[in-house]
Amino acid sequence: MKTPICDFVDGYARSDALRLHMPGHKGAGEIEQLDITEIDGADSLYEANGIIRESEENASRLFGAQTFYSTEGCSQCIRAMLYLTALYAKSRGHRPLIAAARNVHKSFLSAVALLNIDVLWLYPKEQTSYLSCKLDADTVEQALSQAPHAPDGVYLTSPDYLGTLASVESIAQVCRKYGALLLVDNAHGAYLRFLQPSLHPVDLGADICCDSAHKTLPALTGGAYLHISEDAPAMLREQAKNALMLFGSTSPSYLILRSLDAANAYLDDGYSEKLAEFVARLQGLKEKLAAHGYCLWGDEPLKLTLMPKTCGYTGKRLAQYLLEQKIVCEFSDPDYLVLMLTPETGEQGLKRLEQALLSLPKRSAITQAPPAFHSCHGVMSVREAMLAPCETVAAQASLGRILAAPGVGCPPAVPIVISGERIDEAAIECFSYYSVDTCTVVIE
């Protein structure tokens, strides 16, 4: 597969041109020489009609959708998805309403606030962590049938941060029945398209989807895709670039664009076979760990999520143990340890991880359970709360206050309490359990 962005950028780096344009480093350095701006021939991300357009068309063929690049991660794509849904709502003649699984990324909340979108929160029949929210089609259908008016979209995070895949295909059928778009935050699952069979949300019926290429593919941090299904309303494809432009910088990184372009060639050159081989090896490791006594969570092929309390360790303590072995995990909390692997981890990397985990001394199981997940009562809209006068207070002193901004870091960037909800005693208990020290609350 051709790599037009790589070819142009690399050719310019070799040209010995006197750079009297941005950036200020003038190409002095191994990395800097590839960091260019929109010079003649370099195209323009949001008005693409040259090398960027050609590269995006290559990505579209690979993903079986109309694919657009982001250099600002899925955060930009999520905001664009909600903007497109707001346009869809306008075409239907009412205020936008989105039914969303509760474990949304905080960029969803910022988009809801900026775009003044109403949200109907969806909860699973059983929930053990605020990071996971696996819905079935029946739960979604019940919510849509009882909504004040037909929601314009249903929003899922799949895979979620712990590695749980949603029932996208059956939920897509419900969405079609009610005329709602299906939006999927697939930030952790760009590789799912290349499994046999594909588990990618677009192939399972999603209308709009975003992937963080940088999370699971060999692309630089910030590289992401916005996918619009060929079966989705045409207006979504027509307005996608405008949607991304609304939330994007006018100085997109050509280092990131170049890496997305290079990823196309990588994906086109036997990646499916390489992925299948690695997934099989990782599955073998998962089976060994389960036989050794580890409790595993989730069904995402490239994520290894452990619940190590059964072995006598919190997730935080196990992460520290691995760090001592020079193995750095993606995320840990009192209950979970999340490890993200790709074919680039390699066989030696898997063996190193296996040796570390199987040599961990076993202890008596920790029986302390996490606080029961609950939903606080919403008293303001997300927009009202996020734009209201606010102050930062100690989390333990926030009882009865209304949360303003979702002050949660990344990872995991999934809020325990939603902006506009009144903080209750159960939320205070969660703050303590997850070591949340402060929160930003509305000044009433």
Language-model segments: residues:
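Charge-dense polyanion-binding interfaces
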Residues: 438-444
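Conserved PLP-enzyme active-site core in the AAT-like
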Residues: 2-8, 72-295
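Conserved N-terminal alpha-helix of the aminotransferase class I/II PLP-enzyme fold
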Residues: 32-76
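Short active-site oxyanion
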Residues: 66-67, 94-98, 416
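N-terminal "arm"/small-domain region of PLP-dependent enzymes with the aminotransferase-like
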Residues: 1-50
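Short glycine-rich or small-residue beta-strand-to-loop segments that form or flank ligand, phosphate
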Residues: 68-70, 154-157, 338-342
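Conserved C-terminal alpha-helix-loop-beta "cap" of PLP-dependent enzymes
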Residues: 287-425, 429-436
